[in-house]
A protein has these predicted regions:
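PRPP-associated nucleotide enzymes
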Residues: 5, 9-231
């Protein structure tokens, strides 16, 4: 009851830089239910597909907030006036768990460049860990829109470390963080560490972290569910 009350208070205080897409009922809820459900999530194809679907929904919602310019398109019967993105974002994902969400984002923003970053936890004790960023492949990121995806925003430390590593490739014009599940603790850390204009888009917000920094109720290990148990 205490965690639920804390979550309700936190959600009430959210500013417009945090978008919780579970606040209103939509088909997103079905995909969220399936990635969480222990009777469904062990099908890796279905799990990856649902992460892709969640990312597509987030991408569509983000697409409403970026800048467009009007163009003329010649059809077989005449001229149509349409809108085209003024600045294609760069889609950045955290390996390996973020790959499925990256595919969903790329399906929506299909003309975009991509960047890939490895970030993992090294546990020094059951409750303590360090974040390592060892691999980064990216285009020029200076003055560009970044969309950084990862299924789980648990502590926020990986996201912050990845953001800081990406700064070697340039400073962003705008940052979007796209995740399936986030915690209040992670949201607060990311908001303190990233630019004030950074937006966090999440499929849900869960109130609790275990002593090992796993989200409750969460869904388990997204990378293992999507791509197999690592050793």
């Amino acid at each position: 009851m205490g965690n639920l009350f804390f979550l309700l208070i936190f959600i009430h205080k959210l500013n417009n830089m945090v978008r919780n897409l579970s606040e209103k009922a939509s088909i997103l809820g079905q995909y969220m239910a399936e990635i969480r459900d222990v009777n469904i999530q062990n099908d890796p194809i279905r799990f990856r597909t649902n992460l892709e679907r969640i990312a597509e929904i987030i991408a569509y919602e983000i697409s409403k907030t970026v800048t467009y310019h009007e163009i003329e398109v010649k059809t077989p019967l005449g001229i149509s006036r349409e809108f085209r993105l003024t600045d294609d974002p760069v889609l950045i994902t955290i390996l390996r768990a973020g790959l499925a969400m990256h595919n969903g984002l790329l399906r929506t923003f299909d003309r975009c460049d991509s960047a890939f970053v490895s970030a993992y936890r090294e546990h020094t004790s059951p409750e303590e860990f360090k974040i390592h960023v060892e691999y980064l492949a990216a285009p020029n990121l200076d003055n560009r829109i970044w969309i950084i995806s990862d299924p789980m925003l648990a502590t926020g430390r990986s996201m912050v470390n990845v953001y800081n590593a990406l700064l070697e490739y340039g400073k962003p014009k705008k940052v979007y963080v796209a995740v399936s599940i986030a915690t209040p603790q992670a949201i607060e850390l990311v908001q303190k560490s990233l630019p004030p204009s950074a937006e966090i888009w999440t499929g849900a917000i869960d109130a609790e972290l275990t002593a090992e920094s796993y989200i409750v109720p969460g869904l388990g290990d997204a990378g293992d569910l999507a791509y197999g148990v690592k050793v």
